């Protein structure tokens, strides 16, 4: 079982989009029984809140439901539980360090570093551009799945 945790600031936009896009890609590839995929926040601001409505709508446009998902904060145990901890931006990486300390097992990376366009996934909470975030996350998850197959 390959265990992947996607992480962003609040766990209401980018990381749940990544979680559900990856679940969709894995399902379409017939690999659902080989993956455990989840998402979490580095902050406490949105704990218990559902996925932000514009992010829900963007997923729904592509036939993907995130119904029932609520934000949770990552924990130190997540480093032990998951094989891959995938951050959306450099700020997430810095904030993750308070939970995981170092990364001796080399489990932590940026999503876009798995593509030909390394860097950050812009936060649509601030940009308002959920389409650009969709495109980046889809590209990142597609590349990550290819690596993990």
Model region roles, listed by residue range:
Residues 1-81, 146-149:
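Conserved active-site segments centered on acidic
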Residues 15, 89-90:
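Helix N-cap/beta->alpha junction signal
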Residues 84, 90-149:
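Phosphate-binding/catalytic loops
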